[in-house]
Amino acid sequence: MVFSNVLNQSNYYDVSELISSLLKTTLGPRSMLKMILDNQGRVIITNDGNCILRELDIKNPIAKSLIELSNTQDIEIGDGTTTVVLIAAELLKLAKVLLQKRYNSIVILNSYLNALEESIFFIKDSLSIPFARDNSKDLIKVILTSIGTKLVGRFSRMICELSLKAVKINQKKDFFKVNTNFKIEKIPVFGVEKSKIIAGIVISKDVSHPKMRRKISNPKILLLDCNIEFKKSEMRSNFEISEGHRWKELIKAEEDQEIYICNLIKKFNPDLIFTEKNVSDIALHYLYKSNISVIRRIRKSDNERLSKVIGSNIVSSIERIEEDDIGRAKNFSVRKIGDEYFTYVIGFDFSKFKTILLFAPSKDILDEMERNLHDGISVARIAISSQGLIPGGGATDMAISNNLINKSRIFKNNNFYIYRAIASSLEIIPRTLVENCGVNVIKKIVELKGNQENKFCNYGIEGRGGNIIDCRKIGLFELPEVKINAYKVAFENASILLKIDKILKGKALN
């Protein structure tokens, strides 16, 4: 093994500035959108930090660590994916400057970790205020802070209400999972305001026979993951037929087998059958004559969700059907929306599965709405169990910055300069918010810093006009969990990268 492409420690932080500059314009209500052409030829229009980074094809290890950073924040918290990358990039940029000034990397690392502890303590002790978790208005304000900056800002309140309702239906935070307890079904037709949550499931399927019933009240439902057709031999078989009537007998034997299978099903009097596999035309005909509707070739995941809606098991063999395998629903209907047919199965109140229906005129908007809904659900899930709120609009970041400056005065060594440099780096969030509003950055940051130094820690940036406002008065709040996790991940990532002095790329000898 030989090593090539050795990079110096002070050089490999440059890529973090590139990533930071890419995401800066996506922060806040005045954020810009990115148009991404992915490797499958699809066009994605979004300002979601994690979505943008996820689609980048980058081989640089530092850039990959920042992308992983954003992904971690998205999985654990669901919000703050842009913030965490901007802070981490600023800390790496600062590390580069300090290393060039001959500061020891271990001294910088220790200062970073101390500053992190100080910041987390300050958020919990001085900035966090209690709030009524059962007050829907306060919860919606918190979710709006996250969702209001997205592409679908016009419909942000509706998405907030959907997110909160989805989480409140299942109060157990750890048990709530999208795609496990909830499904998001996207329907590309006009009428965003028609988006809603239903107690059941929606599948993009129609009945398999045009004359079968498309509307049934209190249906008895059977779920299968097997075929309803003549069972073919697993081994290859050849038949020689010398007489014409023998061919008719073979066809009749197949038909009798399918009629026998249909009669086995008929004994349990189901109104509706869902199966993951195929149903032959002969079986469809006999089931239709028996007044049984059939929907075939559904996804395995949808079949499992149906099982939760109707409270029954999925049957693998028709010969093993039992009475307990027949489930019940409140209502079944097939509706034509746009050019497609959608199957609605509405469960009873005890149903363990819900579907969030999203309507929008285009698939691009639907995809962005889904991303925003995931963020909203994540924030709502944390908010319901949160112990407090902190001011948004960069107020928290500026307050932490001022606190670190005050703490730096107790040091008389190198930590004095490093603490002040870290404090300056944390101003990246309010500074970026002001930049994106197109107003004088220096003037506004000095004004904000002045307000903060006068103990007005609630003052931050109003993201649409760039004005200095009292965040508590206008209800601009964030969750301390989001900010604390963003700081932890950003500082710890920067600390790990500080301990790397070389990047070595290995290649095998020929």
Residue spans for each PLM region:
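Residue-level signature of catalytic and energy-coupling elements of molecular machines
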Residues: G28, G78, R102, S163, ...
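A structural-propensity feature for long, helix-poor, extended segments
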Residues: K101-T149, S217, R320-S351, R409-L479
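Short, ordered loop/turn segments at secondary-structure junctions
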Residues: D38-Q40, N50, A89, Y103-N104, ...
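Active-site cofactor/substrate anionic-group-binding motifs, chiefly glycine-
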Residues: I44-Q73
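Elongated alpha-helical scaffolds
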Residues: D79-K93
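Extended amphipathic alpha-helical scaffolds
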Residues: M1-I45, G49-N50, E117-A360, E368
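Extended, low-charge hydrophobic alpha-helical regions
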Residues: L7-S10, D57-K59, I159, T355-L357, ...
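Glycine/serine-rich anion-binding loops at beta->alpha junctions
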Residues: F3, Q73-T83, L389-P391
